Amino acid sequence: MSAAQFEARARQLLPDYATAYFGATAGSGVSDAESTADWSAVRFRPYTLRDVSTLDTATTVLGTPVRTPVLIAPMAQQLAAHDEGEAAMARSAAATGTLLGVSTHAAVPFSAVAAGGAPWWFQVYVTRDRHLTELLVERAVANGAAALILTVDMVALLPAAVNPRSWADVPGRARMTNLTPAELAAAGSEGTAIDPTVTFDIIRWLHQLSSLPVVVKGILRADDALRCVEAGAAGIVVSSHGGRRLGPSITPARALPEIAAAVSDSVELYADSGLRTGEHIAAALALGARAVFLGRPLLWALAAAGSEGVKAVLDELTVELELVMTQLGVARVSELTSDVLETPTQPVQRSAIHQPPAFG
């Protein structure tokens, strides 16, 4: 089954509240739709007469080797998709040879994620009660997390008036399973909320707390990227939160080139939001990303077919990437650079494409 077929199957199997939550976008959904469209709009300049008999999609992310540059994004409420949640996702990552992000709102214990055998990074929402964040980070470190993903683009949930779907309530959903009921009760709903006062200083604080590299997720501006670097970030995820942050925001495909030029090689760059094909992944790598994070397609696959479904989608996209590499004349993902892209000095009059010839 393809990713699209897994999604269709998942929508048949899941209750409405789950499909509404998983598919929710901000506002009218324009950012989500444009994210995919902008990856599709990237144009390539293929090499010819290159030896592509042996292809290599392997790379490293913050020193961790992976067999594919397609990583698993941190996603909440995975128990609503599958009764093993992130534990099943972790097994898929291990079987594929990739890495996964694990949400602050993970539905299973960190120990169950670690048992899956894949390298993993812990995604952090900094809470108003800072002690809760400290506890979560310490427990993630104790269970083998190799890095922290600091999500900075979701300061508050969008009000239901903006998009009722974004507030879909998943019955029985897990909230911060890696905190005890007593810890959650002591903090209250106010303490578990995202802290809107955090600034760039939080990057250094998290690094000092954990001794782990900190990857900042949700950057769409070059000046913000530079400030993250100055604050000690080891990586940046150029992301629009899958279109769930702000309806008319800039897309990662548009933001990535500027950010890549600004930070140069000072940090590793990653991208997410709207990536659906091997061509999209190749475009992101050529625009400056070292790897990409994939979200919803894997969540739908998890719901439709468990860990095997997730692995099937990851394998499918990696095979698609290999095909694109073959057609571009590059044998290794490290060769996917701006050299294979259309440049501003080679404009294409898109409106003229596919127009019928004029006669008379």
Protein language model annotation of sequence segments:
Residues M325:
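An acidic-aromatic loop/edge-strand motif
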Residues M1-V66, A160, A168-T199, S334-L336, ...:
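An N-cap/entry alpha-helix motif that binds or orients negatively charged groups
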